[in-house]
């Protein structure tokens, strides 16, 4: 998806460890961050710029600082901080901006049998001024997100996912 977005001449901005996860493939710009708060600051700064494409942000503290370490209070505090930031962030979105929030796996801080990833379904929240409210149910694959993002950006991209763009707009 990132390579297709970049090849289409659009911005493909990586914030956090996204650049490393994909070995630098497909990003047109990247910036690391030191914490969730710093990542949210970068997201706010990029949203204020006039760019066309994708800004892909990874807030790693949920996983590394709180989930794997089974720090329930830290996780709750991080969610509270993120929630407060998100409200302000969404208010500042442009008319056609869309935000997708998800996770790549579960990491329940209350599960103490192991510090490995846990097997919950992860949320998928879609926000924007023109996004229709509702439930999309359980998606079959993360590839649905790639199919949706590329469709919304008008980028040709073959993958096994099913776009949900028509469900949200």
What residue ranges belong to the model's regions?
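Feature captures the catalytic ectodomains and active-site-proximal regions of enzymes
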Residues: 1-169
